[in-house]
Amino acid sequence: VLAIVPYIILQFKGLGIIVSEASYGSISSTAAIWIGAISLTVYLMISGIHGSAWTAIVKDIMIFIVVLFLGIYMPFHYYGGLQPMFEAVHQANPTFLTLPKTGLSISWFISTVMLTVLGFYMWPHTFNATYSAENENVFRKNSIISPIYTLMLLFVFFVGFTALMQVPGLQGAEADLSLLRLSIQTFDPWIVGFIGAAGLLTALVPGSMLLMAASTSLSKNVYGVLVPSATGKQISILAKCFVPVIALVSVYFTLYGGNTIVTLLLMGYSIVTQLFPAFIFSLMKNNIVTKYGACAGIVAGIASVMYITITETTLGTLFPALPQIIKDTNVGVISLFINLVVLMVVSLATKKIAAQPHFESGAVDGKQIL
């Protein structure tokens, strides 16, 4: 849930930006966030996962059309082609298309991608999508279609490169406005509205899945454990009650937080990646990790992520004498390392306790406990 909240904030921030810009400022970002949060909460409580699934289909089709069109049209409209666009960007800023030697360097990029990949399937809403699949053929189709999403990023980059020259001066959080600002100065309002509608769905669909995953996790994995006598119906009702609560918390941090969309996404991934070590060990036949070790490692990893994020700590500030290539490594690696160390130490210390029949392993009613 701690990892999901920054991700929900990301969706609300994007929603506010899209509505405000697409309406040419007639609707404020704050009003858009509140309207979106309320609509999303009501929509989710009524329709559930099936409503989100059908909306996702419409969203995917619209966003594919918009991204493909903008990625091809923008470079040719402003520069006459892709090569002239890259030449113009290089002439204006020769180092823009390369990673810097320090800071956000190659080592930072590689380590960030690694952490993101490890955390991708740790998101609860990803598991929801997996478990709700009709049959195994759905996974085969997704394996074929999924690379298209990666290909779409190429056209997003083209739009970004175009905006670099045509919408200059966007610094910090304003960089999130680049696509819509460029669209507004290029197209008629009705086209901007279509682009905004596609963008709106890209915020609402993941937002609904995230809210559902967070509320379900709290009701089933927290309340359900604390109150074992709770029935499935009670847990289901409580999950719906958690939806507006989580939405309100997310709206608060959306309005009073200053992080950019990319920063929020990376922070969420840094937190959820802490589930990866315990998950991998759980798949092993001879699992040496105990539930105490897994929980301790996750808590230690998340605590270090929160501390690092709040204090803006980097490997360079912790170990200034290290080579630059190591200092630039994503600091989330430290949290993952702390997680692994604590996980192994606590597991070894509690191995004898966990081996007792009434704990992690053994038989209850003739069934093996995993």
Where on the chain are the PLM-derived regions?
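Membrane-embedded helix-loop-helix hairpins and adjacent transmembrane boundary segments
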Residues: 1-370
